[in-house]
Amino acid sequence: MADICIGCHLSTSDGYAAMGRRAVEIGANTFAFFTRNPRGGNAKPLDPDDVAELRRIMGEKDFGPLVAHAPYTMNLCSSTERTVEFARTAMADDLRRMEELPGNYYNFHPGSHVKQGVDRGIELICEGLNQALFEGQHTTVLLETMAGKGTEVGRSFEELARILDGVRLDSYMGVCLDTCHVNDAGYDVAGDLDGVLDEFDRVIGLDRLKALHVNDSKNPCGSHKDRHEKIGEGTLGLDAFRAVVTNPRTRTLPMILETPNDLAGYKKEISLLRGIAASVEA
Ligand code: FE
Ligand code: FE
Ligand code: ZN
């Protein structure tokens, strides 16, 4: 059986090829990165040589798909028109730039409806996606499962399903399941991963599940908090991650660590989880 595909969030500050090299150094074969500065403004144009070098590294080291992350400040369903406008422009621009790195994922937080209500929120998110997605694109856009902090949309599988229902080019859409977020949203991912996956399948369809954010949580199930913890040191515990890296329905997906760590810490978590996955295969 193939090795798991796992990595962490990396900084773009030294360019794309540097992220690939750093990933290899810490034993990763995928990674996440922010597509632009979260403070807004224009994104740097991609340097074609830098991107080509990353693609070479990814091929040589047999990387799985990358899971790019839109900036947290991008809110397609804000109550402020300027914020919505920025989100729409940023997403469309990100998807055009992602074409330089075809075949990867672009994950984003559906948004916060800021007292407009979840129905209006979902409507705005769908409008934004329908503007940004284009026929023939080579990126799959992932909705992230959210903890349900404040007025976050995407706190339940039902809300994600309603967004997917409203997107015209939905063959370019999928879901990224964040283990900390679904726990905080009230799904017992630690106690009953199979039950949560069955529920996901019933409401959304497991064919939509494309990637995982692998995080422990500082808070109990249903707390709606969204505070990540190191693997095995939170309320989910190591057994939860043993299940994630060995379950046939999740072990083949790209897994991104967003735990509070430096690179050395990520390297340790990657080798820990690879070790567990390998021990079960044998
Ligand atoms: Fe996220
Ligand atoms: Fe996440
Ligand atoms: Zn989070």
Give names to the regions the model predicted.
Residues M1-A70, M74, S78-R96, S279-A282:
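N-terminal pre-domain/capping segments
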Residues R82-L95, V118-Q131, S156-D165, L193-D198, ...:
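Short, electropositive alpha-helical surface patch
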Residues F31, C126-E229:
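Acidic/histidine-rich catalytic cores of soluble enzymes
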Residues R21-G27, D47-V67, A92-P102, N130-Q137, ...:
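Acidic (Asp/Glu)-rich catalytic clusters
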Residues H9-S13, R36-P38, A70-T73, G111-H113, ...:
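Active-site beta-loop-alpha junctions enriched in small/polar residues
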Residues E60, L76-G174:
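Active-site acidic/histidine proton-transfer and metal-coordination neighborhood
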Residues A32, K210-H213, T252-T259:
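Conserved active-site loop/cleft motifs that coordinate metal ions or position small ligands
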Residues A23, H69, A87, M98, ...:
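Conserved, mostly hydrophobic/aromatic
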